Amino acid sequence: MKRIHLCVLAGVLATACASSKPDYSFLTNDQWAAELRKRGVDPQFVSNPLTSTSDMKETAEQLARPGGPGGPVEKLRNLQSGLFDETQFPFRYQNRGTFTAAEAFYRREGNCLSFTNLFVSLSRSIGIGTKSAFVTRRIPTERDGDLIIVNTHVVAVYFEGLPKPYIFDFDRRPHERVEDAKPLDDLWVTALYLNNRGADELRAAHPEIATRYFEYATRLAPEFVPAWGNLGVARRRLGDLPGAFEAYRRALERSADDPTILGNLASLYRFVGKESEAQAALAAIDLSRATPHVLVVRGDLELIKGNVSGALRLYKRARRQAPATADPWVGMARAELARNHPERARNYLERALTLEPNDPSALAFRQQLEEANRRARNTAK
């Protein structure tokens, strides 16, 4: 699938933390393993994403300079600055590659989630109680064929005794300013780690491994909708269509108008020959929440229905959100060809292939366009 981040409302964080439920934050390794077993997850097959080592504590003390002036926030700022300074901490940031905090520390590489978990683990090792927080803005997705994989983004938060939380963001890519986030306990952090690991395995064409990761994620955080959606994708890849439908049902129980879930459900309905159900699922999508890839899928539906201008509007909207992604450009090319504008279609296609030369949908449309040109030449003869 194609392409799953510093101020937060204090009230939102306080509400998210105020609960009569048990708090699974700041678990020891033994406590963490015991909680996993209670939920049917074998800790022998799952690494604790927040575990620290003595080497990590030593590095944290050096970067945060806890012996110097300043309180916890000052130390956290120093720690973040040190992690961003390649002369102090060489680190290769990558969009993919989900590691535990310890793995990211020793490998000196990882994605946003890995980097955030590393920061949380390092700060906890020197006695500062930070948490990871799930960003609740539009969730990033990736498209693979006719399915959409959901990624997640987290930040680190610290708000002990403070009127307003401090947010530490480790996504090095351009992105929207974080306006809302949900603090996570250690089981939720593990679920996010497993969800991202599952997405990595799906990209590597290992759906059986991905399925196990997603199933574990849903056991640790049953309300985590993206994990249910990704479980549906993985089960479909394995040919378990009833299991895929069940995963999407569980997701929609928790978020009835989730655009990505509805888009993948529509794809599954279409795969089994239920076109009316597929169109109903797509029509139920709340376009105000839709990711670029969901907008493209919705545009495809309008194109199939013959609403070319409506499809083109959706493709252009997707392009505005993700101008460096091939999908919207391919959609626009298809719409222009349907409007009998082959030259404009060719220009859009060239733009898509410039952005992503190996994009399957762009390559397939290029072949379609070449065949259309051959037919036109033969007709002219």
What do the predicted segments below correspond to?
Residues 40-104:
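Secondary-structure boundary elements
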Residues 216-217, 250-251, 281-285, 317-318, ...:
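Canonical positions in the second alpha-helix
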Residues 210, 244, 277-278, 311, ...:
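Single-residue signature of alpha-solenoid repeat helices
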Residues 92-228, 242-254:
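Long, contiguous interaction/recruitment modules in multidomain scaffold/adaptor proteins
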Residues 196, 230, 264, 297, ...:
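Canonical tetratricopeptide repeat
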